[in-house]
From Swiss-Prot:
InterPro entries on file: ATP-grasp_succ-CoA_synth-type, ATP_grasp_subdomain_1, Succ-CoA_synthase_bsu_CS, SUCC_ACL_C, Succ_CoA_ligase-like_bsu, Succinyl-CoA_synth-like
GO molecular function: ATP binding; magnesium ion binding; succinate-CoA ligase (ADP-forming) activity; succinate-CoA ligase (GDP-forming) activity
UniProt family annotation: Belongs to the succinate/malate CoA ligase beta subunit family.
This protein's name: Succinate--CoA ligase [ADP-forming] subunit beta
Amino acid sequence: MKVHEYQAKEILRRHNANVPFGKVIDAVGDFEKAYNEVVQKSPVVVVKAQIHAGGRGKGGGVKVAKTKDDAKAAAEKILGMQLITPQTGPEGKKVLKVYLEQGLEIAKEYYLSILLDRAIRKTIIMASTEGGMEIEEVAETHPEKIIKIQIDPGIGIQGSQVRELAFALGIPTEAQKSFTALVNSVYNAYIKEDAALLEINPLILTKQNEIIAGDCKMDLDENALYRHPDNEALRDITEEDPYEVKAKEYNLNYVKLDGNIGCMVNGAGLAMATMDIVKLAGAEPANFLDVGGGANPTTVENGFRLILSDPNVKGIFVNVFGGIVRCDRVAVGIIEATKKVNVSVPVVVRLKGTNAEEGKKILNESGMNIVGVEGLRDAADKIVSLIKK
């Protein structure tokens, strides 16, 4: 689960990390009070759009203001704008919140992130002297400037590793105590908050030899949110895909894609195989949808509603293997859903496993325009041919 910059920094504060003072507003009417608090910390105020995407500065979503009038003008311009960045896509994202933050006297910018490397099964700290740039650009143009340090999960980060990192980055001697404190705080936040990613870009060395988190991106592990009810409250559904928000309400695992064949499958592995076979047949899947092992008529109906809410869908491929789930119950769900949801696109169904024959019989005797197919490749070819008619 992604959180906004101002929320990520509040989490860092809880772990005693050095972050700039700031105030968030969601209306221009709140500007005066917020500005008056921030300007007490610094005469320069940075006005930042709050969206779940990077590259905000390139899109005009970050402005440095040296006067109150400039800050207010920036806030008025950014609030409500459709901000387009390299990470939002051409449609952009509407800015509903703006963060007013104290300006800093910057001497040098670095990059720092903590994430899980699944290949080696360890947390890694990744850092670079090229702060303020997208790390992907650095990896492509100057890979030698990226430093990686592996952290053993059993013992955590060690003082020697922090010193190694400071040396590799060329942190001045006068700032190393501040650097050590921040790295330890950020690592503790990453571990204790069950984060999947914690990225600080830029990590700022001020002219006063302080190390401060200038920006912060945090992605929290959704599977661990039950341990952090306070973090659950940080979710901003206006920043999430509306289809995926609806899927959460239905308790379905759904990811929207760009194709035109809706896929309803039980089991993540089979769902991915189904998408592959659709592509092999010459079409593109419209979604990943795993209805899970407890599929029932209600689940199937909700799955149909979700798939058909995408206007790009021209056909539906239902692929079910009956292990825990019974194919006859799925068949009943398909028929009920087809009637209730008013399905007007072709539907191809492949049932295998527990009570598959009973399920096929139910579909055949339903009188509905549902095509039953035996083979996986045959089913993919069939739905592709039907949407082309």
